[in-house]
Structure formats: structure tokens, C-alpha cells
């Protein structure tokens, strides 16, 4: 907000005439969030036990609610710049702030950022747990921060699985609002940034799965499922390679002549959206399968129909994957564009049915199950902690990249088709320059996070008074 006021005072002045009321509430909510955070943090020990623990829980929930409201208000300002509403063609405000807030892209980006922030929050907590685990001085501390890291990774995975769907929904709404904006997003210069995005999201999936596989070492019964890990890894890597395969290659004139065109004859078809939709759905399903194996690792089913239940689950996964492949291949390559685009919806529904159905059935199969042995918290290799670090770094870089794309598709407009950016810097930078700026921003943010970790470490160290000051 400070840089917006400093570098774009005219834009801020225009936005403040429209959103002055919401900006007032934004300031109030900011102070409310700070107050709740202080009480939550400094009342940590005071609010333990009895009725006070419920007050502590309520403060934590209130902190999340206030933070979400802040995000929703800020989202209304940025989406107004992309899909202005409540103003006439000349940009004159009609007086209805709610109409400006409730613009075409407000709800799609609310959903996308809400899910993304849950995943991102889990990754940051996981990174903190990894840091504390690696610096722990006792087995008890290692066990505690191992447990903390697992729960943080669980939250991140739960939000990561629906995140691609929320992103596709947002992109579809952008197309619906403005085809020019949609074409710029996926078919123009920004298309190559989505290749980088695919690499980052693939990194997230591989890191999350790797952590789960390492975490199976906590259980004495994990050896029953470790033999399947290599097959899951092969599928994930294969889907990852399909996901970031570009449709059009960046080539020199000599390479273009040698290849016979900008498209690779074999790999080119993997660069279009039907292949990528298929790949991401397969990655999501196999990530859910990894989590199911982790949950099962320390359990022994006691129900009489366990074999039948397992057979149903295998059939569900097999049928779901075959259906996703059929929809992606047949409708993606052998039908017209209408069916090609529409096929993504039943693919998503298939993925949801497979995951929800299999986990629901699994809960019944392992109801009243026996434990193989108590979980050995802290019995996890240190390299798994670096997977948690990678999750946090990749999420930070990804959020910076997608924020740039979201702003960049407005091109030379501050507010699309209303307020033009007439400055000398109103141009789309090269991909390399944009990537460097995002990298610097990610490094600065991660440095701030590391500083917070260090402050927390310093505040936990207590030194007994000695000498003159000792009482």
C-alpha cells in the first residue's frame, strides 16, 4: 500500500474516491488483527487449561476471520482494476461502493486466493517446524516439531489438491469477462510464464509426496506399502513432464529449419491444455493415494470385508484414471474445441469422486482398526525437512509469479479500459527480467520469514541474571 501511494498517487487517488469506505474498514480491521495477534501471542501461557483454552482457540479463529476479511477487501480493489464495475464508460463513479467491490472477478479470485493462502500458510508453518526440528537438542523436541511439520504439510496438501481447479476456474472467468485478456493470459507472452508455473507446482507436488514417503518411517507397518512408492513416483514424474511440456518451442532460425516448424512432431501434442488437464488430475489422484498409504501404514483393518473394500477401491481408482485418460485423449484430440474445453469439467468431477469415495470407504474399512505399534514421532530423516523448506520457497516464488501475471495482463492499463498508464515504464518486460524481479521479491520475503524465525529463537532463550543485577 505504501508503494502504491508513493509511486502511483493518481491511481491511488482514483481508487480512494471509489473505495474510501472500504479502506476505512480495512484500516480498522488491520488494527483489530494486530490487537488479536498480540493477545493470542502474549497470552499463550495464561490462556491454558479450563475455559481459557477455548478463549485461546476463539482468538485463533478470530485472527483467521479478520485476516480473511482483510484479504477480501484488498481483492475487491485489485479485481476492480481488472474488471471495473460501478462506474460508467468514462470511469465516473456512480456512488455504489458495493457494486464496485462485487465486480465480475471478485469471487473467482477470492476462492483462488483463499485456497492458496491456506496452502501457503501450511507451508510456512512446515518450514518453521523443519527449522526447529533440525536445530532441536533433544528427542522430545524432535518428536514435537516432527508432529508439527506433519500437520502443517497435511494442511498444505489438503489445500494444494483443489488449488489447480480454483486456478482453472479463475482463468475461465477471465476468458468469460474479456477474451482479449484471456488470450493474453494463456496465448501471448505470458504463456511461457505458465511453463514456469507448471515447474513450480510440479515441485510442490513432488516435495509434498516425498515428505509423506519419508514420514512413513514413523510407522513399523509401513513396509507393507513402501514397495508401491516407486510406481507412484514414476507416475508423478511422468505427469509432471507432460504438464510443463510447451506447445511452441523458442527456437533460433537454424533450429526452426532443422525441426521443420515451431512444434515438435512427437512432444508438441503434449503442450495443449487437454494433456495438461489430464496430467494434473492424475497427479492429484496419486497424491491422494500417497496420503492414503501413509494413513494405512500404522493400521490393521479388523472388518471382515476388508478384501472386498480394497477391491472396490482399486476398481474406483482404475476406473477413474481410465475415464480421465479417455476424456483427455478422445475429447482433447479427436473432437472440436467445444468438447475439448468442456471435457475438463467431467475430469475434475471424476477426480473428486475418486478421492472422496476412496477416503470415505477407507474410513469405514479402518474403523476400530488396530495399531501396528505407537507412531515414532521424530523418526524421520533430516532430508525430509528440506522438502518442507522447498515447499515454502516454491510457494513464495509461485505467488509472486502469479501476482505478476495477474497484474501484467492489464498491459498498459491501471484500470482496464478506463485509466491508462501513460508512463514510460508502461510496457511488458521480458520474461527474464520479470523472473528476476519475482526472485528478488521472494528472497526478500523469505529473509523476513527467517528473521521472524530467529526472533522467535532469541525470545525463547532465557539467561539467568548474574553479578550486579542479580537479586
Question: Residues of each region from the PLM?
Answer:
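Polytopic transmembrane helical bundles with strong interfacial aromatic enrichment
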Residues: 1-471
